[in-house]
C-alpha cells in the first residue's frame, strides 16, 4: 500500500485509488506480516494498482509466491461503487501472529497517506505489539 515501497519495487505501477474488499479482514500472519482472512461482514481497505507484466513478476517474487509464503488469488474488490477483479496475496500460513518490528507503523503510515477511514486505521494500529488486540469495533468490520 505504501507509495514509496511500490515505486521502488514496481516502478511501472499506476495507483488507481483506494478500494475495499468485502467479506475479508486484515490479519498479521504467524510470520509477522499482513494478510487477509475471510470474515463475513468485515471489510479490508487498500489500494488498487495497475501493474505491468514486469511489476507483477517483481511483486510475485517479493511476496515469495514461488516459495509458497503467499498465495496469489483474484478477488472482487469495490472501487467507487463498481466491482473489479483484483490480484490479492494471502498468506499460506493460517492463524495470527505478532507483527515484525516497524511493520505496523509502515502499514498505518500508508493508510494515513491514502486517507483510509480513521476507524479502519485505528484497527490496523491495534496490531502494534503495544496495542490492544481484543474485540474490534463494529464499525471497522473486524467484529464477527
Language model regions located:
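Glycine-aromatic micro-motifs
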Residues: 1-144
Amino acid at each position: 500500500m505504501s507509495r514509496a515501497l511500490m515505486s521502488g519495487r514496481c516502478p511501472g505501477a499506476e495507483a488507481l485509488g483506494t478500494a475495499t474488499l468485502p467479506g475479508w479482514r486484515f490479519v498479521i500472519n504467524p510470520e509477522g506480516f499482513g494478510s487477509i482472512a475471510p470474515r463475513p461482514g468485515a471489510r479490508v481497505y487498500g489500494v488498487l494498482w495497475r501493474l505491468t507484466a514486469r511489476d507483477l513478476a517483481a511483486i510475485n517474487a517479493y511476496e515469495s509466491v514461488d516459495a509458497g509464503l503467499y498465495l496469489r488469488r483474484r478477488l472482487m474488490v469495490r472501487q467507487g461503487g463498481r466491482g473489479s477483479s483484483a490480484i490479492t496475496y494471502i498468506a499460506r500460513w493460517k492463524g495470527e501472529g505478532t507483527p515484525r518490528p516497524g511493520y505496523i507503523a509502515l502499514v498505518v503510515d500508508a493508510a494515513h497517506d491514502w486517507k483510509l477511514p480513521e476507524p479502519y486505521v485505528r484497527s490496523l494500529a491495534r496490531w502494534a505489539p503495544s496495542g490492544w488486540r481484543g474485540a474490534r469495533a463494529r464499525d471497522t468490520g473486524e467484529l464477527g
